[in-house]
């Protein structure tokens, strides 16, 4: 696991625990987003996500962490000029109408600066994943997406 992940993982673990255990926290994450009306009270797809992500073998990191785009030119979700290749975490929610939302979570440490094009790349990558999940065997099918950024006030 990269050094950054090991530093961020305790925070991401806490976020994941909240998302997996509390509808209130899931609702809080999507409140104020375009997904709010459709996904309030949605179920979390823990077992489905784990099964898809670990279908070949269990990885070192948690099943919800570090969704990589790929470093080669074949990655259609790479953003021109940006060095960002991954989403720190993705959580999948199913609405009462059986639609699925991918909640892409990005984490920045206090006083950590954004790289060139990094904040702009988050929603573009999430949108790309929603259009290309059928070619990504470890990404759950989903209809909609949002990005959520956890960071210090100084980062904004």
Mark where each language-model region is:
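Charged, terminal alpha-helix-loop-beta segments
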Residues: 1-156
